[in-house]
């Protein structure tokens, strides 16, 4: 695989062109910074009527980062996430094209109107546990996410990530060839995205694995919290 350096803007712009992204990284490796960068890019490219952001963030690391007029929901517990994701799944199911939708409508996505929906999940390992996974209701929608205006971006710690391969959301993303990012992590976790292992690295140093570009190295710029 070819390895090249890429900047922050290209990484985020490309992600918003794709519906699915997952990221693994240790503590202080740049996971929440990446999500803040995604939020900045969403608000740069879309107006508040064109994009709504739904945050699942049990540690509240992104609290105050999403402008109020873009915020669809901020979910900080299992119970809140269960209700919020169930409602969101029902909403996006209503956008699934029926048999009367023409090929031209499919190409232009003109059979529905409304905002793009961005689901940002920080510390996914706190969300998908042995007690259940309230985000799993989105799994059946991921194959059609681009057609439905649904985007799912999640981060997870590297520890135990090899077990996450069997998680319904991550497994579906993997099956669909979603782009994955590895920040700093322990290589003893094994192959996490394709055949790529995590490596110890400075914050923001990323290995980006995509179906069409293979393995690309990038340094994600630090996006500071807005309250600092």
Please give the residue ranges for each predicted region.
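Single conserved hydrophobic/aromatic residue that forms the stacking wall/gate
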Residues: 1-12
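Phosphate-binding P-loop
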Residues: 13-18
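Hydrophobic anchor at the beta1->P-loop junction of P-loop NTPases
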Residues: 23
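The conserved Walker
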Residues: 27
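Conserved glycine(s) of the Walker
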Residues: 30
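Mechanochemical coupling/switch segment within NTP-driven translocation systems
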Residues: 33-35, 41-135, 158, 185-188
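Alpha-helical scaffold elements adjacent to nucleotide-binding pockets in ATP/GTP-utilizing enzyme cores
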Residues: 37-38, 84-87, 137-141, 169-176
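Conserved ATP-driven motor cores of ASCE-family P-loop NTPases powering translocation/secretion/packaging/pilus
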Residues: 92, 142-144, 148, 153-227
């Amino acid at each position: 695989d070819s390895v090249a350096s890429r900047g922050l803007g290209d990484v985020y712009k490309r992600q918003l062109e794709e519906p699915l992204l997952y990221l693994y990284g240790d503590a202080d490796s740049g996971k929440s910074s990446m999500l803040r960068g995604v939020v900045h890019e969403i608000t740069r490219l879309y107006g508040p009527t064109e994009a709504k952001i739904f945050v699942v963030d049990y540690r509240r690391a992104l609290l105050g980062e999403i402008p109020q007029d873009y915020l669809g929901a901020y979910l900080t517990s299992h119970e809140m996430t269960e209700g919020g994701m169930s409602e969101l799944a029902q909403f996006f199911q209503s956008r699934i094209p029926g048999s009367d939708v023409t090929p031209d409508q499919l190409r232009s996505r003109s059979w529905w109107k409304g905002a793009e929906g961005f689901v940002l999940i920080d510390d996914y390992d706190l969300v998908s546990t042995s007690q259940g996974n309230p985000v799993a209701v989105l799994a059946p929608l991921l194959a059609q996410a681009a057609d439905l205006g649904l985007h799912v971006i999640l981060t997870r710690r590297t520890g135990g990530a090899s077990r996450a391969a069997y998680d319904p959301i991550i497994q579906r993303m993997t099956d669909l060839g979603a782009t994955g990012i590895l920040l700093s992590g322990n290589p003893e976790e094994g192959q996490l995205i394709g055949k790529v292992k995590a490596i110890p690295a400075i914050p923001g140093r990323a290995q980006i694995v995509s179906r069409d570009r293979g393995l690309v190295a990038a340094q994600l710029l630090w996006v500071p919290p807005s309250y600092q």
